[in-house]
Structure formats: C-alpha cells, structure tokens
C-alpha cells in the first residue's frame, strides 16, 4: 500500500503535527505513514525494531503494516488522536492515571531480551546509554542557550565551569544496572486507545539508568504538577519496585532530571 500512496499526492492525506525531528507523519483512512529524510531513514528501522520488542513483551506499540524503505516510508498502526496528556488534563483523578502509566514503566523495565530483527531481516539490539551520549545531550544547554545569550558568554569562564558541573553530576550517579529506557517517556508520547495505553516515539530507546524514564515522566516541564504530587508518584513507583537502596534511586532521579531537562 505504501508504494501506491507514494505515487499519489501526499497532500491528499492529513499531515500530523510531529516531533522536532526529520520525520513527517501522515494519516490515511486507518494507518499512519512515517516519512524520513533519506539521511536519517535508518531511524525507521530502529522504530520498527523497538516496537517489536515492546509488542513481544505485551506492551501496546504501533505494529508495522508495510514498508518501502527505498522511498523512506513505513506504514504503522494508528492509535487515534487522544494522548495521555489530554486525558490527564481532563481527569479528576490524575494520580490514578499516573499509576496506570507507572504499570507500563514497570513492564518495560522488566524486559530481559533486547534483541530482534528489523524489517530488512538484520539483527537489532538496544545500545547502551553511554556517558558520552548523555553528556553530549546535556551540553546542548551550553551550545544553544548560552551561545544565544552573548552577555552571559562574556562573563569569563561560565561555560567552562558549567561544563565541569555537568560532568560532576554525571559522576555522582550511583545505580550501575541497566534497563530498557524509552528516553522520551512523556504523557504526550502515550496514546489512550481502546482503554489501553500505547507507547509511541520509541525509536531512541536504549539500555540505561532505571531512574531516567521516571524523571522524564515526573519532571516533564510541559505539564504542571505540584511538588507534593510528584513526590506521591515517586513513592508509588518505589513501593512497586521495592528498591533495596531507595536513597541511591532518588539520588539518580534528581541528577538525571537536571541532566535531561538541560537539553530541552
């Protein structure tokens, strides 16, 4: 079906608002077309592969319907328009909605097999969320925000000192074992479909710190919640997982919340 659609005018299909990336999304009658720039089309392979891992572990994610990799397209399931951000905003029992999301997080952190085959029949395995990758993302704050503010840049060695501070934050992370990390575990990346929660935008998943996705969820700057509400969510998560060393988890949660919000 994708090859046929490519030969047609894409303007006939509804273009959806996507993320700030190299991808474009179009809605057909009952599916979503994902188009990628040719330089980044390997991202389509990653998206399909990660979705396969999630689906295999009974987590709702968009399944592949068809693909035309040569034309930079894949066709995936459509989970509708309602995401969990909309549902939470209209809910009178917000904590209950977050508890449902925490169950999904619990499921993905229990995944043990991180290997699969992409639709080109090549092996895929989740990569590690390395120190270099995390710091590179956090340094975006220095490259984008500070560079845009010339007055700040002129204040001596501020940029250099902030870089040292970021490095020291990373060095203070305590937890060593790694789990499946979605990396964009926000309520806007969760669709509410047929009374279930579906994860989307999972192509950047890695093996990393178990506190990372929780920090993404709780300290998401796009949705306002009180500090007491955030503390309640953290308590619910810790009680579910029964971490032996909660102080280590909270330490890493706080550090990763800072590091990941620096790149926004």
Language model feature labels by segment:
Residues 16-20, 66-69, 256-257:
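A short beta-turn/loop motif at secondary-structure boundaries
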Residues 22-28, 33, 108-109, 166-214, ...:
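Active-site acidic catalytic loop and adjacent metal/ATP-binding pocket
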Residues 26-136, 174:
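ATP-binding pocket architecture of kinase catalytic cores
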Residues 126-129, 246-257:
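All-alpha amphipathic helical-bundle segments outside canonical DNA-binding/catalytic cores
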Residues 10-26:
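ATP-binding glycine-rich phosphate-binding loop
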Residues 139-149, 210-244, 259-264:
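Active-site activation/catalytic loop segments of kinase-like enzymes and analogous catalytic loops
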Residues 113, 124, 132-133, 137-180, ...:
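An alpha-helical support segment within catalytic cores of ATP-dependent transferases
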Residues 1-7:
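Short, Lys/Arg-enriched N-terminal segments with co-localized hydrophobic residues
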């Amino acid at each position: 079906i994708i090859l046929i659609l490519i030969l047609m005018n894409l303007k006939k299909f509804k273009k959806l608002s996507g993320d700030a990336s190299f991808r474009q999304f179009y809605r057909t009658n009952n599916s979503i077309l994902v188009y990628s720039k040719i330089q980044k089309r390997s991202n389509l392979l990653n998206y399909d592969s990660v979705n396969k891992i999630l689906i295999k572990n009974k987590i709702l994610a968009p399944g592949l319907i068809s693909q035309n990799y040569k034309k930079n397209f894949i066709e995936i399931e459509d989970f509708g328009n309602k995401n969990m951000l909309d549902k939470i905003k209209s809910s009178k029992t917000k904590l209950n909605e977050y508890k449902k999301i925490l169950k999904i997080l619990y499921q993905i952190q229990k995944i043990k097999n991180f290997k699969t085959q992409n639709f080109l029949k090549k092996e895929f395995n989740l990569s590690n969320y390395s120190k270099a990758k995390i710091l590179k993302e956090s340094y975006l704050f220095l490259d984008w925000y500070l560079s845009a503010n010339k007055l700040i840049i002129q204040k001596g060695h501020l940029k250099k000192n902030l870089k040292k501070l970021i490095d020291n934050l990373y060095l203070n992370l305590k937890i060593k074992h790694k789990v499946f990390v979605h990396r964009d575990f926000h309520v806007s990346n969760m669709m509410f479909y047929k009374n279930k929660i579906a994860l989307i935008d999972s192509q950047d998943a890695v093996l990393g710190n178990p506190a990372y996705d929780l920090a993404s969820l709780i300290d998401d700057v796009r949705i306002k919640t009180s500090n007491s509400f955030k503390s309640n969510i953290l308590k619910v998560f810790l009680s579910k997982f029964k971490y032996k060393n909660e102080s280590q988890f909270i330490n890493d949660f706080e550090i990763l919340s800072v590091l990941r919000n620096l790149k926004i």
